[in-house]
């Protein structure tokens, strides 16, 4: 089991203090080594590429926990069953979003295998990622999982 970073240290290269703070326990979750060094690392690299291309992204990352997830340290630390990443490109027109859910284990294959709608992440987490968007815009953006809009 690795300490999987929610905000990767590689995204904080502007400042040594920021890099150091990325190792705080508030920024890590128990993540299987196969995920942390495999599919999740590939997704983090892709997000960095998209950020360079689109100038700015909003990125939300977190665990998806549910009853029955395994635990560590005598039940004090839950091992999430999955992780999500919700990404918005707010500075491009039309605005676009994409979400990913990766099970906490080996995740092979391409990004499209794990792409999902923001609505699905909201359903699993109980969170509302873009509450200030007008309802029609929120519904349009959150209901689809169009990875093609990000790769072209």
For every predicted segment, state its role:
Residues 1-152:
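Domain-level detector of nuclease and nuclease-like folds
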């Amino acid at each position: 089991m690795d300490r999987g970073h929610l905000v990767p240290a590689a995204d904080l290269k502007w400042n040594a203090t920021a890099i150091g703070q990325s190792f705080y326990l508030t920024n890590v979750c128990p993540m299987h080594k196969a995920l942390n060094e495999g599919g999740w690392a590939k997704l983090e690299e892709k997000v960095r590429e998209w950020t360079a291309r689109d100038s700015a992204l909003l990125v939300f990352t977190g665990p998806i926990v549910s009853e029955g997830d395994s635990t560590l340290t005598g039940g004090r630390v839950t091992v999430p069953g999955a992780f999500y990443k919700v990404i918005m490109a707010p500075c491009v027109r039309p605005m676009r979003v994409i979400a990913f859910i990766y099970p906490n284990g080996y995740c092979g294959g391409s990004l499209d295998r794990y792409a999902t709608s923001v609505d699905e992440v909201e359903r699993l987490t109980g969170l509302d990622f873009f509450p200030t968007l007008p309802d029609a815009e929120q519904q349009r953006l959150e209901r689809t999982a169009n990875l093609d809009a990000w790769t072209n």
